Every structure is written in C-alpha cells, then in structure tokens.
From Swiss-Prot:
This is Uncharacterized transporter sll0355. Residues 22-146, 182-308 form the EamA domain. It comes from the Bacteria. One of its GO terms (cellular component) is plasma membrane. The chain crosses the membrane at residues 15-35, 41-61, 72-92, 102-122, 125-145, 175-195, 201-221, 238-258, 264-284, 286-306. Gene3D superfamilies: 1.10.3730.20. The keyword Chaperone does not apply. It is a multi-pass membrane protein. It holds the Pfam family EamA. PANTHER family: EAMA DOMAIN-CONTAINING PROTEIN, INNER MEMBRANE TRANSPORTER. Keywords: Cell membrane, Membrane, Repeat, Transmembrane, Transmembrane helix, Transport. It comes from Synechocystis sp. (strain ATCC 27184 / PCC 6803 / Kazusa).
Length: 330
C-alpha cells in the first residue's frame, strides 16, 4: 500500500512538472484554431488581459505585495511592452501565417538568444557545449524558416534565386515568430531586474494587462467588432488559451520554480514544441517538409544543449576522469 501511494505521488509530481509545457504547446494550437474568424491582435489581447486579471486575483488571495513605487512600475511597463505587447503581437501575426507546431519550435528557440544576451550583458560563459548548441540552433532555425528551394539550390551548387516579394521571407510567418522569440528572450533577460523591485507573480499579472492594452487598441482600430465572427468553438479555444495556456500554466510554473525545480524546468523546455507539433498534426493536420523536420530536430537538440550545458559539462568531466583513471592490477 505504501509503495502504491509513493508511485501515485511520483506520477502526480511528474504530470505537474510537464503540465506548463503541455498547456503552452496546446494553447498555440487553440490560438491557431480561432485565427480564421478574427484578427491576430484580438487573439493576443484575449490571451493576455483576462489571464492577467486571473493572476492578479490569485496574487491578492495570497496577499502578495503590489508595486510600491514608480521605479517598480517603470520596470513592469518596460517588461509589459517587450514580453507582452511585442511578444504576443508578433506571435499572433506569425501564427496567422505559419503552423502552430512550427511556430512553437521557433518561439522556444529563445534560449539561444538568451544565452547570447546573457553572455554580452552579464558576462556569462557559454562554453563549448553552449556554442555547439548555438550553431545547431542557428542551423535548425534556418532550415525551418528559409525556403527549401534555397538549400536545394546550394546543394546542387546553383546560384540562389531570392524573391523578397509576395509570400517570400519578408512576409513569412517564420520571420514574425523569430521576432517574437527575440522579444521573449529580451523579456527573459529583464525578469531579474523586475523581480528585484516587484513580486514576480504580481509583475506577471500586471505585465499581461498593461501589455494587452496596446494590442486591444490596434485590434479595435483594425475592426470595431473583431469578435462578431467567433463561434462557440472559437470562444472555447480562446478560453483554453487564456485560462489554461496563460493563467494556470504560469501559476504552475511559478509554483514549481518556488520549490527549487528550476533545473528540471529548464531541461523540459523542449516539450512545448513537441506537444505543439503533435497536436497541430493531430487536430489541424499540419504537415512539415523533410528539411523542416530536420530543422526541428536540430533546434530541439540545441535547446537541450544550451539549457543543460553546465550539467552536461560536469557529466563529461566525470566521464573523462573515469576514462583517465589508471587501472590498478592486483
């Protein structure tokens, strides 16, 4: 009986650990499902503002402190514009033009940019494993985002015929997703500065609300009634992306982070695009080319190498010390 109870506890802990990544991945699919009936900026607005209200209500219930000075509010506003307005705005624009699974892979490549920014701003050491991950990441994103024809022309030693008009790179969903990923990376770098002055959960709630307001204004300028064509299924998709994909996912993530599971969480980042790819294929029947699948594989390996570079370095050092250990004959 005790063994069974321990097994159930381990299963619940494991499910809780992967829950945020499952919710974030499937939320991308839910957002994609409603974009045909409304504008990208309205979807981004609904993803942010109601979720921010829910997070703040929970924070109030936990008696977490509100911002106390204008310096704290200043950091929240900056965080909101970068990680709220720009990130969700670019994401929704990109999602309208590309698949949910592919978009999620590009979005979750942001540890690549975070590593470079941290190296530049905080003098963090990337190391050999990190640089290998960065190279794989750049290659993976190139395979995902650039036209397949470019690579086939290079393979056959032909000159590149680049078309920047129409549906080419300049207006591609992959480019918007890359901008979203860069915005998220800058937002990630801002988090330590925000957390020093404001409770992180409270900052998350306010940044969702403040970041959503410019998106709401743009959505209403584009269409005075952007909700009029959304059916019951579409509202269900939006509710899922808002409640589960934002409020609950962030709540679980912060709960796990407060318990000291940051290493486990960072090592599971690659699960978000895997869930998004799986459900976009299952529900939306999205298909990728062979080169794009290769790019997905490169990018996922890159995310793992960058997030786990310190742990991998220790493991490789231990293996090397065992290999070099002299054999003592009796």
């Amino acid at each position: 009986m005790q063994i069974e109870s321990k097994t159930n506890t381990n299963i619940r802990s494991g499910l809780t650990l992967i829950a945020p990544f499952f919710l974030w991945g499937t939320a991308m699919v839910a957002m994609k499902g409603v974009l045909a009936d409304t504008t990208p900026f309205f979807v981004a607005t609904v993803r942010l503002i109601p979720a921010g209200i829910l997070v703040l209500l929970w924070a109030m219930g936990q008696k977490r402190p509100q911002p106390q000075n204008w310096q704290g509010w200043g950091w929240i506003i900056l965080f909101a514009l970068v990680d709220g307005t720009l990130f969700q705005g670019f994401l929704a624009q990109g999602l309208e033009r590309t698949g949910a699974g592919l978009g999620s892979v590009i979005i979750d490549s942001q540890p690549i940019a975070v590593a470079l920014l941290s190296s530049w701003l905080f003098k963090e050491v990337i190391g050999g494993i990190g640089w290998l991950g960065l190279l794989l990441g750049v290659g993976g994103i190139s395979l995902i985002g650039l036209p397949d024809e470019w690579f086939y022309q290079l393979w056959h030693l032909q000159g590149l015929s680049i078309n920047w008009s129409g549906s080419a790179l300049g207006s591609s969903g992959e480019l918007w997703m890359l901008l979203a990923s860069l915005s998220m990376a800058v937002g990630t770098v801002l988090i330590p500065f925000v957390s020093r002055r404001v409770d992180p959960v409270v900052a998350t709630g306010w940044h969702m609300i403040i970041g959503g307001l410019p998106l709401l204004a743009i959505a209403l300028v584009q269409d005075s009634e952007p909700w009029q064509n959304i059916d019951l299924w579409g509202w269900g998709n939006l509710a899922y992306a808002t409640v589960f994909g934002s409020a609950i996912a962030y709540g679980i993530f912060f709960y796990l982070a407060s318990k000291g599971n940051l290493t486990s969480l960072s090592s599971l980042t690659f699960l978000t695009p895997i869930f998004a790819l799986s459900f976009s294929n299952l529900i939306l029947e999205e298909q990728l080319s062979s080169l794009q699948w290769l790019g997905v594989a490169f990018t996922l390996v890159s995310i793992y190498l960058i997030n786990q570079r310190e742990q991998l370095k220790i493991q490789l050092r231990d293996i090397w010390s065992l290999v070099r250990k002299p054999v003592i004959n009796d």
